[in-house]
């Protein structure tokens, strides 16, 4: 019997997919495409010679073998994170490494970075976005700024900053702008709506809040990541749905409009850090972010 381990990238893709029960969410967390995660899962199944998932309606269900590997891989990765964190304990002089999605970084945090650095000069903030696993337990990451829904994991210290609000947005350059800008929300049922595979429930959830049957919506062009979705909306390619803070600058500049406003979701913008990685700077950062949101909401 071979004792060779499967490729590490394949194990990471499996561990994230099994933990989140979603290929799309695993892709978003690992900041790769849906297809890349699917390929790594196939590599792992071929290496082991067994099936780890079976189709369950529109989702996936772990096989018995998959459940065994999920438990083992979760324990192994957690142990690796703990040991690596112990080996790389930061001193007070080390930068504070904050992880967040590229979309949140580019569209919300960067416009405020000058004020943050001026108000917290000793923080020495280092931003981690783009490639990499944005799991807050990842070695080398001090905290994670993320939209997420409670309940929070027991091993996490979480600072809730504000409730998430989402809504449809479009550009004045969009061909349907004049027709839709003063129409009721139900008028969107006739549009091919821009959407992202990382948040497949965004449109259906919004529709239910507005008394619209989700099945009446028509999906148009899809995008792997939210950043590209919003770029498409700014370019006038259609109506997108987005968290309010990520389109705030575009709304102020007139590049986008939100005729139907924004609605709260169960999610929060929150700062996460593992309980085992207590750092007083996280509290300072959370206080600054919350004050910034109160001073200038989005």
Swiss-Prot record:
GO terms for molecular function: DNA-binding transcription factor activity; sequence-specific DNA binding. Gene3D superfamilies: Periplasmic binding protein-like II, Winged helix-like DNA-binding domain superfamily/Winged helix DNA-binding domain. Keywords: Activator, Amino-acid biosynthesis, Aromatic amino acid biosynthesis, DNA-binding, Repressor, Transcription, Transcription regulation, Tryptophan biosynthesis. One of its GO terms (biological process) is L-tryptophan biosynthetic process. It comes from the Bacteria. Residues 6-63 form the HTH lysR-type domain. Pfam families: HTH_1, LysR_substrate. InterPro entries: LysR_subst-bd, TrpI_PBP2, Tscrpt_reg_HTH_LysR, WH-like_DNA-bd_sf, WH_DNA-bd_sf. Residues 23-42 bind DNA. Belongs to the LysR transcriptional regulatory family. Activates the expression of the trpBA genes, which encode the two tryptophan synthase subunits, and represses initiation at its own promoter. This is HTH-type transcriptional regulator TrpI. It comes from Pseudomonas syringae pv. syringae.
């Amino acid at each position: 019997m071979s004792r060779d381990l499967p490729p590490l990238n394949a194990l990471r893709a499996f561990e994230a997919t099994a933990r989140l029960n979603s290929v799309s969410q695993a892709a978003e967390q690992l900041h790769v495409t849906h297809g890349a995660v699917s390929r790594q899962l196939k590599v792992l199944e071929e290496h082991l010679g067994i099936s780890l998932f079976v189709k369950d309606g529109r989702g996936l269900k772990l096989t018995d073998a998959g459940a065994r590997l999920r438990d083992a891989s979760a324990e192994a990765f957690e142990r690796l994170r703990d040991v690596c964190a112990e080996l790389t304990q930061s001193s007070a002089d080390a930068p504070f490494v904050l992880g967040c999605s590229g979309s949140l970084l580019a569209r919300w945090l960067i416009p405020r970075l000058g004020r943050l650095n001026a108000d917290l000069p000793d923080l020495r903030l280092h931003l981690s976005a783009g490639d990499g696993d944005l799991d807050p337990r990842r070695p080398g990451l001090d905290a994670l700024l993320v939209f997420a829904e409670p309940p929070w994991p027991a091993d996490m210290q979480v600072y809730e900053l504000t409730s998430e609000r989402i809504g449809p947005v479009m550009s004045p350059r969009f061909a349907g702008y004049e027709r839709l800008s003063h129409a009721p929300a139900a008028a969107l049922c006739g549009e091919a709506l821009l959407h992202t595979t990382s948040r497949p429930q965004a449109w259906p959830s919004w529709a239910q809040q507005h008394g619209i049957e989700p099945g009446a919506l028509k999906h148009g062009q899809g995008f792997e990541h939210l950043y590209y979705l919003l770029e498409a909306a700014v370019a006038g390619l259609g109506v997108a749905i987005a968290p309010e803070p990520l389109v705030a600058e575009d709304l102020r500049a007139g590049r986008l409009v939100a005729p139907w406003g924004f609605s709260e979701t169960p999610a929060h913008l929150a700062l996460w850090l593992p309980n085992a990685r207590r750092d007083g700077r996280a509290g300072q950062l959370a206080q600054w972010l919350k004050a910034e949101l109160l001073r200038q909401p989005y």
